[in-house]
């Protein structure tokens, strides 16, 4: 009996040993497969990272697009204060937005940062795919999305997407406590950097922070909450100090940046294909539907993903569809593709079959639209990527003389002014209107910019007044180079009415430079005259009605025009964009229609005569006005978005 019992015990022990051995083998095999899979994911997406590496070296050139990049680099070199000396959609770290070689140290910083952000983006994707045990199909989908989206994705979106992915992973699959806190400090610093590159990035960062604050309070995680908030605020302060900014100017920077953002939808809107608008609305609609579904069905991970990415999607939507041209809509489609691909990969098990199919349909529609606009994006340019890296490394390792020669060559190509103009300017302070800052950079002029150094960016009456006040101050430049130029079929004299009035009062024409672009050279008057005006008449009218223009002699005529959105228009402006407004200028010979930015017109638009060329502009500066305008008419195709009543106050000022 005892022998049978002993035999049974040995048999049980052998069975247990065999099971343990089998389990160990299975575990070992599973670990090996997992390790191989992770290595393969890292390798494949590292290759994709190389194939989508951004341009790390651009040489400055003369154009509107490059002009503001040059301006931001020059502003950094001059130590100008953002919010006080400079008011622009970009902030104190705006020079890092695009690595143009305007000055070696700033280029090196921006190039290194651009490369770091790209690597961080790829790293966050790899971590996501590894941590969530993504399938091969998921990896293929994400790889395709990256190949199409990354080549044109802007640096602030790359950075913020990386941040929201890492934070999302920390929420649904927490790291160990210490690494988690280190991650929070790191992403807070990255959000602070993005916030100081571009103001809209601060809005996205704010939405991410709000989500994390609510989440930490809900989970009663006080230490992580404090870590995130204090790290973000501390990083902002440190970066402001490192960039030479005074903290006291930061509130003004926020206020003016908000004014720019608020005016953008009205001033810069452009309409594009209806099909692309429908895709954008479908993307937003599907995201809202997914949020409602996740709340009703208690799908916390899906709720977290949608909420943490909500600000990113909203800003991308506004970015792409307010100024709806091929480059801006590409950015929205690329960002939407990244968001929906990541959401599908991380949360497909929480979706119903219908929602999975709808998400996949949207993803492939986005892929189709991106591919249609830029079909070569999917074709790897291996040689080109090696050239990008090689040219950046070459410049970084060149001696100072070689770099100076390269920069001088770029500046030489920008120079379009006559020798007489350069001789006249000498070392006097100078500003350029409307935007060609490349001349100041190319000739090494003593640039003294107005706060909004691109006229078309003074979207509101308050921003226009900032420039006007600058030209009345002691800092006003000695010389102005004034050319005709604007955007979107606007009327250039209406872009900055208060600023124009101040220039007419305080500057005098000297001569015209006609070598390439036509510039009127203006000098500051010996004595600054006080601003005086006299009201002529006040007229209440309606949209679409002709407004007669008074005829006056010996003085300049201006008109303050007051119109506004109704509730529907304000809603459209907030969530999408309002319909454009137009102004028709009628003379005895011509009737011309221009896009009209009515928020600026509150400062008083110039109506003494119509202006078509540089000679007409010179006549205005000389006081030789023709009083040829008979009437103006303000109209829109969609008056339902506006209060129909308009008030016009005509006033005159001395020549």
Positions of predicted regions on the chain:
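Short hydrophobic/aromatic helix or loop-helix immediately within or flanking a transmembrane segment
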Residues: 71-74, 78-108, 194, 205
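Transmembrane-helix motifs of polytopic, lipid-linked glycan transferases
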Residues: 112-142
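Extracytoplasmic
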Residues: 61-66, 86, 90, 201, ...
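Membrane-lumen/periplasm interface segments of specific transmembrane helices
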Residues: 225-267, 316, 372-373
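Short hydrophobic alpha-helices at membrane interfaces in multi-pass membrane enzymes
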Residues: 136-142, 162-192, 222-231, 299-310
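Hydrophobic alpha-helical membrane-interfacial segments at the cytosolic entry of transmembrane helices
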Residues: 41-48, 216-243, 354-367
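Perimembrane helix-loop-helix junctions
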Residues: 204-234, 295, 338-351
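Membrane-interface alpha helices of multi-pass inner-membrane proteins
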Residues: 146-148, 182-199, 204-210, 234, ...
């Amino acid at each position: 009996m005892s022998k049978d019992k002993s035999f049974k015990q040995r048999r049980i022990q052998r069975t247990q040993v065999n099971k343990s051995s089998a389990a160990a083998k299975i575990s070992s095999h599973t670990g090996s497969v997992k390790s191989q899979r992770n290595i393969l994911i890292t390798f494949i997406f590292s290759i994709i990272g190389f194939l989508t590496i951004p341009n790390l070296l651009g040489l400055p050139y003369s154009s509107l697009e490059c002009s503001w990049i040059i301006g931001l680099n020059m502003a950094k070199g001059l130590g100008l204060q953002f919010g006080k000396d400079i008011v622009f959609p970009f902030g104190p770290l705006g020079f890092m937005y695009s690595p143009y070689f305007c000055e070696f140290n700033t280029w090196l910083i921006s190039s290194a940062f651009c490369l770091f952000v790209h690597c961080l983006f790829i790293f966050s994707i790899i971590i996501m795919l590894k941590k969530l045990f993504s399938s091969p199909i998921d990896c293929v989908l994400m790889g395709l999305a990256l190949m199409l989206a990354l080549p044109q994705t802007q640096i602030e979106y790359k950075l913020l997407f990386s941040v929201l992915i890492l934070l999302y992973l920390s929420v649904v699959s927490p790291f160990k406590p210490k690494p988690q806190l280190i991650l929070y400090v790191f992403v807070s610093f990255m959000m602070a950097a993005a916030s100081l590159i571009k103001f809209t990035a601060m809005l996205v960062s704010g939405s991410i922070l709000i989500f994390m604050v609510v989440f930490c309070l809900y989970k009663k995680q006080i230490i992580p909450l404090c870590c995130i908030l204090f790290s973000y605020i501390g990083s902002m302060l440190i970066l402001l100090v490192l960039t030479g900014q005074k903290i006291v100017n930061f509130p003004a920077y926020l206020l003016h940046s908000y004014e720019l953002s608020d005016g953008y939808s009205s001033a810069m809107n452009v309409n594009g294909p209806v099909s692309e608008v429908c895709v954008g609305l479908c993307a937003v609609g599907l995201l809202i539907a997914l949020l409602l579904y996740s709340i009703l069905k208690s799908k916390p991970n899906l709720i977290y993903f949608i909420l943490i990415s909500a600000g990113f999607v909203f800003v991308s939507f506004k970015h792409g569809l307010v100024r709806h041209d091929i480059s801006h809509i590409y950015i929205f489609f690329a960002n939407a593709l990244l968001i929906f691909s990541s959401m599908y990969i991380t949360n497909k098990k929480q979706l119903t079959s219908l929602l999975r199919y709808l998400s996949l349909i949207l993803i492939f529609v986005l892929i189709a639209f991106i591919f249609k606009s830029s079909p070569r994006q999917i074709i790897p340019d291996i040689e080109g990527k090696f050239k990008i890296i090689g040219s950046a490394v070459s410049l970084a390792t060149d001696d100072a003389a070689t770099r100076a020669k390269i920069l001088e060559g770029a500046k030489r190509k920008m120079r379009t002014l006559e020798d007489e103009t350069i001789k006249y300017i000498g070392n006097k302070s100078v500003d350029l209107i409307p935007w060609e800052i490349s001349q100041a950079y190319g000739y090494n002029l003593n640039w003294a910019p107005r706060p909004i150094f691109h006229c078309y960016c003074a979207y509101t009456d308050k921003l226009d007044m900032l420039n006007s006040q600058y030209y009345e101050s002691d800092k006003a430049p000695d010389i102005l180079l004034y050319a005709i130029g604007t955007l979107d079929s606007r009327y250039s004299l209406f872009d900055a009415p208060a600023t124009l009035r101040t220039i007419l009062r305080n500057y005098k024409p000297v001569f015209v430079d006609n070598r390439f672009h036509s510039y009127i050279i203006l000098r500051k008057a010996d004595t600054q005259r006080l601003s005086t005006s006299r009201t002529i008449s006040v007229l209440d009218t309606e949209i679409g009605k002709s407004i007669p223009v008074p005829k006056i002699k010996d003085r300049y005529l201006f008109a303050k025009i007051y119109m506004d959105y109704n509730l529907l228009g304000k809603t459209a402006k907030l969530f999408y964009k309002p319909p454009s407004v137009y102004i028709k200028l009628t003379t005895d010979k011509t009737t011309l229609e221009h896009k009209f930015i009515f928020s600026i017109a509150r400062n008083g638009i110039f109506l003494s005569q119509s202006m078509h060329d540089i000679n007409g502009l010179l006549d205005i500066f000389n006081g030789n006005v023709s009083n040829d305008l008979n009437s103006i008419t303000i109209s829109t195709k969609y008056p339902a978005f506006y209060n129909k009543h308009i008030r016009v106050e005509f006033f005159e000022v001395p020549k």
